[in-house]
Design a protein with these regions (language model features):
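Substrate-binding surface in catalytic domains of secreted glycosidases
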Residues: 140-149, 225-229, 233-350
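Short, acidic/polar
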Residues: 112-127, 190-205, 259-268, 382-393
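Substrate-binding cleft and catalytic face of glycoside hydrolase catalytic domains
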Residues: 94, 153-191, 199-207, 211, ...
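Primarily a LysM-type cell-wall glycan-binding module
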Residues: 1-19, 42-69
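Active-site groove signature of glycoside hydrolases
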Residues: 132, 195-226, 276-290
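Conserved, mostly hydrophobic/aromatic
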Residues: 131, 214, 277, 318, ...
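Glycan-binding loop/region signatures in secreted carbohydrate-active enzymes
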Residues: 168-183, 322-390, 421-423
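Glycan-recognition patch characteristic of GH18 chitinases/ENGases
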Residues: 99-195
Length: 423
């Protein structure tokens, strides 16, 4: 499963000849249709088929899957373009299997809002095991506030593809904005906790969720124990009724780490309280900060190693970002606001501006600079090299799996890579 880094003068066809694979498949797998040309330094996923089926007249997907003793979903995973075909074409090539063995049998998850594009959702559901639907808020009395857009259709699509939907609980008030006061009320008041837990159980049952993910941030240090107690009480009730609870953790590297984002996140307590944890190992480079990789590998490794010292490895999910940022230079603290971009979009920008993509070996992250008029920008994003490095780390530590924030933007090469490495 090579990852090819484009050199100056190379074309899709010369690369296809080099690996003896289809040029059309390289374009499709790497979502190159929007690019006028390849970019020096761009990383391309090259999947090498080990077994291919040529469609015969009248054959169906189900018949082909049965012929090779694989599932229909396996066939779609290896050939996601089938999602957009109403029938098979005689003579069409379908990949039955690819070369290479998976690194681990990890679980794959990701967050999504109910307004995700249907075509993105349908494809990503081929490759994940759990979808965390963002999000339910709550009132000071413990009443649930549902998402502004009804999420029922996402739940139904998930179950249609044997993917487990999980309700995400956030401290969002009726205004739809973050409210740290709600965390304080919940942490201090067991009556509010009881009401919220009861409402969560009812909603999980009615909607068809398999559990709850608690995603709270900026918790007061004095609410540390009360928050962990709430997660524990929620987990006990959910487990008794056949559901599970996960908790999202800010990226800490020590128990004494200062800052409102970190101090009340007691990895040991929360690891005991929840069934699983989701490490938010991203946002080192963020909207209002200086240009940096979103998830530099040394930092990610440091957080994971601290988590492993506090939490059983089978409970840990490593967070991976599915986005990048573009910063206007020079960076001015309190003034500069980075623009959020997709990883496929980053390659398109580099192609349009005719600039080379560079790769920081220490951070294991791609980046580049471009100009519009007299304005200069710096971009950090993810590509298949940086994703591969994170998946290798997850496999090395033998943890539960990986999870994405978030699933809203296309990144097909990532999902094909995940399918090869973790399934």
């Amino acid at each position: 499963m090579p990852i090819h880094v484009v050199k100056s003068g190379e074309t899709i066809y010369s690369i296809a000849q080099l690996y003896d694979v289809s040029a059309d498949r390289i374009v499709y797998d790497n979502e190159l249709a929007a690019q006028q040309n390849l970019v020096p330094g761009q990383a391309l996923l090259i999947l090498m088929p080990s077994r291919v089926h040529i469609v015969r007249e009248g054959q169906t997907i189900e018949q082909i899957a049965e012929e090779y003793s694989i599932t229909v979903k396996n066939l779609y995973q290896n050939n996601p373009f089938l999602l957009n075909q109403t029938y098979l074409l005689e003579g069409q090539s379908l990949v039955i299997s690819y070369e290479g063995e998976p690194l681990m049998q990890g679980r794959i998850s990701g967050y999504a809002y109910p307004f995700i594009e249907p075509y993105i959702l349908r494809e990503v559901l081929l490759y994940i095991d759990e979808i965390l639907i963002f999000s339910y808020g709550f009132t000071a009395e413990g009443e649930l506030i549902p998402p502004q857009i009804d999420e029922t259709w996402v739940i139904q699509e998930a179950w249609n593809q044997q993917v487990e939907p999980i309700l995400v609980l956030t401290p969002f008030a009726e205004t739809g904005t973050f409210n740290s006061g709600l965390i304080q009320i919940l942490s201090e008041n067991e009556t509010v906790q009881d009401n919220l837990i009861e409402n969560l159980l009812e909603t999980v049952r009615e909607k068809g969720y398999v559990g709850v993910d608690v995603d709270f941030e900026y918790i007061r240090p004095e609410d540390q124990v009360g928050y962990a107690d709430f997660v524990n009480r929620l987990r006990e009730t959910m487990n008794e009724n056949g559901y599970r609870v996960s908790v999202a953790l800010a990226p800490k590297t020590s128990s004494y780490q200062k800052g409102l984002l970190y101090e009340a996140m007691d990895y040991h307590l929360l690891g005991q309280s929840a069934n699983t944890v989701f490490l938010m190992t991203y946002e080192w480079g963020y909207t209002y900060g200086p240009p940096l990789p979103v998830a530099p590998l040394p930092n990610v490794r440091q957080v994971l190693e601290y988590a492993l010292a506090e939490i059983p490895k089978e409970k840990i999910v490593l967070g991976i970002p599915n986005y990048g940022y573009s910063w206007l230079l020079p960076y001015e603290r309190g003034v500069t606001k980075a623009r959020l971009i997709g990883n496929v979009e980053a390659n398109v920008i580099a192609a349009e501006r005719g600039v080379e993509i560079q790769y920081d070996e220490r951070y294991q992250s791609p980046f580049f600079y471009y100009e519009i008029g007299r304005r200069r920008y710096e971009v950090w994003f993810e590509d298949v090299r940086s994703i591969y490095a994170k998946l290798q780390l997850a496999a090395e530590k033998d943890i539960r799996g990986v999870g994405y924030w978030n699933l809203m933007r296309p990144f097909r090469a990532n999902w094909l890579l995940v399918n090869q490495m973790l399934h």
